[in-house]
């Protein structure tokens, strides 16, 4: 698995929020080639937060993209662990190639982080 797969756990549940919230992970999912937004794609999110380590099962959750290919999931504040504060995101549903992303925050005080997927069919 390419970069960002640290502490990845297959099958994280689809949730409305991870923990107490207060921090937003969001982005888009599009198809490679034509850039079409992809609806109903499962995106898994995890990170080291004020409520737990990125290896803790409770720090993992997933969400689905809407009709515009947009996803958004609230989670506890991300905090630095082994360097810059960052999140982990994965597309792992099988219709497209698996992708792992590890976006880095500009500041530990940021309250949101974006990541954008371009998926290639399998």
Predicted regions: what they are:
Residues 1-122:
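Beta-strand-dominated extracellular/periplasmic modules and repeats
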């Amino acid at each position: 698995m390419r970069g960002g797969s640290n502490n990845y756990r297959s099958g994280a549940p689809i949730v409305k929020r991870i923990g107490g919230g207060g921090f937003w992970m969001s982005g888009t999912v599009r198809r490679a080639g034509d850039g079409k937004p992809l609806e109903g794609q499962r995106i898994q999110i995890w990170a080291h937060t004020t409520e737990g380590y990125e290896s803790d099962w409770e720090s993992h959750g997933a969400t689905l993209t809407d009709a515009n290919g947009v996803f958004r999931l609230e989670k506890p504040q991300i905090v630095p662990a082994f360097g810059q504060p960052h999140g982990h995101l994965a597309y792992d549903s099988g219709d497209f190639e698996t992708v792992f992303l590890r976006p880095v925050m500009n500041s530990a005080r940021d309250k949101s982080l974006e990541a954008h997927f371009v998926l290639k069919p399998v």
